[in-house]
Amino acid sequence: MLGDLFTKPKKRKYATIPSDGTKADVPEGIMTKCPECKKIMYTKELQKNLMVCNYCGFHHPIGAKARIDMLVDEGSFEEIDASLTTANPLGFEDYMDRIEKDKQKSGLNEAIVTGHATIGGNPLVIAVMDSRFRMASMGSVVGEKILRAVEDADKTNKPFVIFTASGGARMQEGMLSLMQMAKTSAAFKRFSNHGGLIITVMTHPTTGGVSASFASLGDYNFAEPGALIGFAGRRVIEQTVREELPEDFQTAEFLLKHGQLDDCISRLDLQNKLSFILSIHVKAPGVGGEVDGE
C-alpha cells in the first residue's frame, strides 16, 4: 500500500472524436477584423461606412480608385496620363518584376491616379496616391504625373486636390527619384503664384520625401484621423535626440495640436467639407494671374 504512493501515475489516454462536419465554414473576405479595436464586422457593412470602423472610427487603407469613387460626383471622373509607367532608368535588378506584381495587385500602372472631376458640382483636378503600388513611393513617373496634373489645373483654372500616402522616395530610381521633391514643390509654387487653390489631404502613411516636399504645401492641409505623418521613423529620431517621444508623435492629431494641420477630418465628412471649400473658392474663367514672388 505504501508502495503505491511512490509509483508513477499512469498516463491518461485521450480519444480523438472525429468531427461531424457540421461546423459552418465562413467564406474568406466576408468578415473583417479591425486592427485597432479588434472587433469583427461584416466587410460589406465596413465598405458601406467608407472603410471606417463602426466601433472605434479606425480608417482602413483604401485604393486610389475606391477613394475617387467615394468622393467625386458619379460619372464625373476623367483620368489623365493613365498610360505613363516607369522604364527602370537605372537598370535596377528585379525592379520591373516588382512593378509587374504591383500592377497585377493594384490594377494600376503607377502609384498615383490623376484626373478631372467634380465634387458637389465643383470642378477640380484630383490626384490620389495608392500605397498598394510600391508603397506609393515617389519615382520619376509619380512626380511627372503630379506635375502634369498641377499644370492641367493651372491651364483650366481649376483647384487641385491631392491625397498623399507614401513611404517616401523610390530607392530603385536613385537621384531621379529625389529630384521629384524639388520638381513637384516648384510646380505647386508656380500654381500658387498664379492664384491656384491647392488642398492636400494626408492619409496613412505620409512619410519620407513626400512629407518633406509637396504634402504640406497646400493652402489647406488636412489629414485623416490616425494617419502617420513624418519624415524619419520614430526609432531613428529617438536614437538621434536620445529622448523618448510622446506616444502620439507623428500622428495627424499630434500635428493638428501643434499647428501643422488645418484640420483632421473623418473620411465620412470629407466629401461635404471639400465641396464646401471648393464652392467658396470658385474662380471664374480668365480671373487670376500671377502674383509677386514667382
Swiss-Prot record:
- All copies of the CoA carboxyltransferase N-terminal domain together span 30-294
Record field: catalytic activity: N(6)-carboxybiotinyl-L-lysyl-[protein] + acetyl-CoA = N(6)-biotinyl-L-lysyl-[protein] + malonyl-CoA
What does the record give as cofactor? Zn(2+)
Molecular function in Gene Ontology: acetyl-CoA carboxylase activity; ATP binding; carboxyl- or carbamoyltransferase activity; zinc ion binding
Its keywords, alphabetically, are: ATP-binding, Cytoplasm, Fatty acid biosynthesis, Fatty acid metabolism, Lipid biosynthesis, Lipid metabolism, Metal-binding, Nucleotide-binding, Transferase, Zinc, Zinc-finger
Alphabetized InterPro entries for the sequence? AcCoA_carboxyl_beta, Acetyl_CoA_COase_Trfase_b_su, ClpP/crotonase-like_dom_sf, COA_CT_N, Znf-ACC
Name the Enzyme Commission number(s) assigned to this protein.
2.1.3.15
Q: What is its main location?
A: cytoplasm
Pathway per its UniProt entry is:
Lipid metabolism; malonyl-CoA biosynthesis; malonyl-CoA from acetyl-CoA: step 1/1
How does this protein assemble? Acetyl-CoA carboxylase is a heterohexamer composed of biotin carboxyl carrier protein (AccB), biotin carboxylase (AccC) and two subunits each of ACCase subunit alpha (AccA) and ACCase subunit beta (AccD).
Q: What does this protein do?
A: Component of the acetyl coenzyme A carboxylase (ACC) complex. Biotin carboxylase (BC) catalyzes the carboxylation of biotin on its carrier protein (BCCP) and then the CO(2) group is transferred by the transcarboxylase to acetyl-CoA to form malonyl-CoA.
This one is known as Acetyl-coenzyme A carboxylase carboxyl transferase subunit beta
Q: Which organism is it from?
A: Listeria monocytogenes serovar 1/2a (strain ATCC BAA-679 / EGD-e)
Q: Which gene encodes it?
A: accD
